[in-house]
UniProtKB/Swiss-Prot annotation:
Listed name of the protein: MYG1 protein C27H6.8
UniProt record similarity statement: Belongs to the MYG1 family.
Alphabetized InterPro entries for the sequence: MYG1_exonuclease
Disulfide topology: none
Source organism superkingdom: Eukaryota
Gene Ontology CC terms, in alphabetical order: cytoplasm; nucleus
Pfam short name (any one): MYG1_exonuc
Amino acid sequence: MTSLIGTHSGKFHCDEAFACFMLKQLPQFKDHSILRTRDAAQLEKCDIIVDVGGIFDHSKQRYDHHQRGFTDTMRTLEKLNFDTKLSSAGLVYAHYGREVINQILGGNVSSSMIDLFYHRLYEQFVESIDAIDNGISQYDGVPRYHSSGNLSSRTGQFNSHWNEPENDADERFQQAMQFIGEEFSRSVKYLANVWWPAREIIEAAVDKRFEIDASGRIILIENGGCPWKEHFFDIEVEKNIADDNITYILFSDSTNASWRVQAIPVDKMSSFENRMPLPAAWRGLRDDDLSKESGIPGGVFVHISGFIGGNLTREGAIAMARKALEIGEENPVKKAKLGN
């Protein structure tokens, strides 16, 4: 007897295509065929049903969200702290997402990595699918422009158009599954192969910050191209060290064979508003003029806003950061004004 994953026939949407893709990644469902029907008797033959049937019951493997009274979110299911009403994609992700991520990455992935990916992928990939399928707008008021490039819109384009025959609907659904699945798998692998290694580098730099300076307010990373801002703020919250007031980050600039001294922004969304900009007397200076003013050899530049500067050597960059801390602490009123 054929094992079946059931979903509805007719026009399909991103949520059930994605739900079916996720289920097919799991050992217990990978050999199941997909039955698209609205016939209740046929659906009863299915081992698991998504986006049809009017029932959400994890114990019975039924994952619909259209029934009256359904209001579940990741928070109500005690999975994550998100309040967007779930679609069939979110329901399947809530219960099987960690296992799906592990399978895509080949298994034996650490639980800490899976937990981070599970949260991040819901926030950046799955939640919008839930919201769009449930008619939840991303903003209040009239949109300023139209966008049809989201995953839900692009997945919907696999449906037959009004002037095309509909005799290949199941094949088109498979194509939609493949499309959304490739997008999701790419996102998972990016996290594992690019995002996670960067996070490990930044976390190690944060943990070793007292080796750079006794204040613990300077962190240094050897990998100049490593993205740091998002990871830094996440790690700061996770380690509960926001009160430590980490102020500067130093990193190598392989392009110019020098080092950078960058002021930590006030939050991850800011670029020019910083906890402590580099000293006002240094700003806009370059080369010998900067070295003379700062008293530190090897000066390269300091941006006119004070958010970043440079030195020819690692030691020079550390010296700039240390002196900037001293000057900033000596001028608390001026520092507060610059932070506004």
